[in-house]
């Protein structure tokens, strides 16, 4: 039996779930409780600390049960490519399928990770928004160093477009065109593009 405790005057605090067990009461923050149900949240900017936590949670859930799906809920404006790629590589590396769900928005690296979910298990809620574009970068310094970084960004752009083509089924030429500038999509448009497999208005029975 679970009870959700939340003080509405302290909205910055994470809600705590109190569970009644045979050994007495146990308390979990809401995210830890959902982790027991194999649910991981990717909320906010994609950066190293967040990525490390998500990778650790996926590895833990794999060790708990390598044959049961992991559910990754995404509401993110994007962020660091290298941090995002650590999540992506782990999703592909572990044995359980990772089902992805966009709630709110999945932009840039958020959209990339959304479409990286297991085939047939990539979803969005009806009013979610998705945005794809080319990687952003900025660097100051000597001209030779700027040139090195520009070449690196072009390599990353090619790598991301190639992976997006693999997961969406879009031709690489079309992806290069579509990611040249910010490209916003509704949930239905993201489904048509191949970023997700279905738009869910209600939880499947």
UniProtKB/Swiss-Prot annotation:
Gene Ontology terms describing biological process: protein quality control for misfolded or incompletely synthesized proteins
Q: Which GO terms describe its cellular component?
A: cytoplasm; endopeptidase Clp complex
Main enzyme class: hydrolase
Keyword list, A-Z: Cytoplasm, Hydrolase, Protease, Serine protease
Instruction: State where it is primarily located.
Output: cytoplasm
Q: Which GO terms describe its molecular function?
A: ATP-dependent peptidase activity; ATPase binding; serine-type endopeptidase activity
What catalytic reaction does the record list?
Hydrolysis of proteins to small peptides in the presence of ATP and magnesium. alpha-casein is the usual test substrate. In the absence of ATP, only oligopeptides shorter than five residues are hydrolyzed (such as succinyl-Leu-Tyr-|-NHMec, and Leu-Tyr-Leu-|-Tyr-Trp, in which cleavage of the -Tyr-|-Leu- and -Tyr-|-Trp bonds also occurs)
Entry's EC annotation: 3.4.21.92
Q: Where in the cell is it found?
A: Cytoplasm
The reply to whether Cytoplasm figures as a keyword in the UniProt entry is: yes
**Which InterPro entries is this protein grouped with?**
ClpP, ClpP/crotonase-like_dom_sf, ClpP/TepA, ClpP_His_AS, ClpP_Ser_AS
Q: Where is the active site?
A: 108, 133
Q: What is the annotated quaternary arrangement, including any partners?
A: Fourteen ClpP subunits assemble into 2 heptameric rings which stack back to back to give a disk-like structure with a central cavity, resembling the structure of eukaryotic proteasomes.
Give the family per the record: Belongs to the peptidase S14 family.
Annotated PANTHER family: ATP-DEPENDENT CLP PROTEASE PROTEOLYTIC SUBUNIT
Protein name per the record: ATP-dependent Clp protease proteolytic subunit
């Amino acid at each position: 039996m679970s009870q959700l405790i939340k003080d509405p005057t302290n909205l910055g605090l994470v809600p705590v779930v109190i569970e009644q067990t045979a050994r007495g009461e146990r308390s979990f923050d809401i995210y830890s409780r959902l982790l027991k149900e194999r649910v991981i949240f990717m909320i906010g900017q994609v950066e190293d600390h967040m990525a490390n936590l998500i990778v650790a949670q996926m590895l833990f859930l794999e060790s708990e049960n390598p044959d049961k799906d992991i559910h990754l809920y995404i509401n993110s404006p994007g962020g660091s490519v290298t941090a995002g790629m650590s999540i992506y590589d782990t999703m592909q590396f572990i044995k359980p399928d990772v089902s992805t769900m966009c709630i709110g928005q999945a932009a840039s690296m958020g959209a990339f990770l959304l479409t990286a979910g297991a085939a047939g298990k990539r979803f969005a809620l009806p009013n979610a928004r998705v945005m794809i574009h080319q990687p952003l970068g900025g660097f100051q310094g000597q001209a030779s160093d700027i040139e090195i970084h520009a070449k690196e960004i072009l390599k990353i752009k090619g790598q991301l477009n190639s992976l997006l083509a693999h997961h969406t089924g879009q031709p690489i030429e079309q992806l290069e065109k579509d990611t040249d500038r910010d490209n916003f999509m509704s949930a239905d448009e993201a489904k048509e593009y191949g970023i997700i497999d279905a738009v869910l208005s209600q939880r499947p029975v």
